[in-house]
Amino acid sequence: MTSPLLELDHVTKRFGRVVIAEDLSFSVGPGDTVGIVGPNGAGKTSLFGLISGDLAPGAGQVSFAGKNVTRLDSAARCRLGIGRTYQVPRPFTDMTVFENALVAAQQGGGLRRKASYAAAASALERTGMAGEANVPAGRLGLLARKRLEIARALATGPQLLLLDEVAGGLTDPEVTVLVEIVRGINAEGVAVVWIEHVVRALTSFVSRMTCLYGGEFIGDGTPAEVFENPRVREVYLGSDTIDTSTVEAVIEEEGTS
């Protein structure tokens, strides 16, 4: 049996009386594709913070590649192989696309000059941004900014890629482009955990989905199994008898609110 690449063991995080994560246990294997859904404020982005090191758990353990990384900060975890994107891409707008990827390779990945240049070039190639390498990032449209955000995470050399709503705000054809980029990254052996309200992006890509609500996991399985889960239906619609297509529509609607 393959050992988990990522493992959260009874992780809890609170801010005062506000529960961010409640006794979460969660694992991801090498090369896995996992989608995470949940209502706004469910704790999805906070979960990524606990995985990436942006947040420290109050209790429990986070392990990555067989190492206890609970007390490591985000920079150390990044260099071990955890790359992530953020909901709102914020590239260095006065730098070129290539320079943005280069900074990520050097500062995030800790790579030296020659290796960092190769990593940056590879990341742009894999995200379809090589042709815009010399374009100032401030001139990019939304899809290109999303691709650059992924490229910056890739430039750090991740074994695990955390995607935080990278399909938000895109048209259907643009979502298709993005999914194919992520599919190619996963085909290289990179595990992907993807938070998303654009359900069609997840259902066309992930093999496993989990639903987070109030800092707790309330459903886990294939996308179909999660959408058919009575608890998930009740959380989204106040009823456990609503059909699956309605649940999917409500999740997407939340992403635009």
What are these regions (language model features)?
Residues 2-257:
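Glycine-rich phosphate-binding loops of nucleotide-dependent enzymes
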